[in-house]
Amino acid sequence: TVVFYGDKNNWFAAWGAWVFNRYGVQDVRLLDGGRVKWEKDGRPLTTAVPTFKQGNFAVKKIDRSIRATLIADVLPAAKAAVKGKADVKLIDIRSADEYNGKVFAAAGFQELAIRAGHIPGAINVPWGSNVNADGTFKSVADLKKLYADKGVDGTQNIITYCRIGERSSLTWFVLSEILGYNVKNYDGSWTEYGNSVGVPIVNNAGTIWGAA
């Protein structure tokens, strides 16, 4: 068993869990609520760094079914959405301002893409919507309703993305590991898509270009 935990509602911990799943590690879990919940519950902390014997894990098979790529998955979905024929649910989990193109990155982070906006056909369900105020995951019923209200009920193929794939890993974890939906995480995310030449982009704020 491998348990990941971290800050910011486990967003980077979820990315680690997604990577481990991709490379075939068995029984990968997230600590519900992460470090913040652990501290609030008064659980013990230490500064000691543990040591372990060297393991012998070897990657036997890469799970390509949980990773979306630009050419094979994302661009076809975007072009289909432009034509009104989308059969894949794209979920942009960034903030509403990032999604609409009002800002190029979340506060405190440098955007690496030259354009702002979102992928055509993508709906916006910010990653923080998956958790309660204490950072723990919402109930299965609440999560199903959250996504059903956006037209996602598990009957479609789903692709999640954010800026670099870490926040979207949390949504991937929720949809895949908690709800059991068929979902891929696009780890290239907006950093790759927003820098790609000739791809369709939706920008609701009129601020498409971040650099000349």
Language model regions located:
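A polyampholytic, Gly/Pro-enriched intrinsically disordered region
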Residues: 45-57, 142-147, 203-212
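Short, well-ordered beta-to-alpha junction loops that form the rim of enzyme active sites
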Residues: 7, 92-95, 163
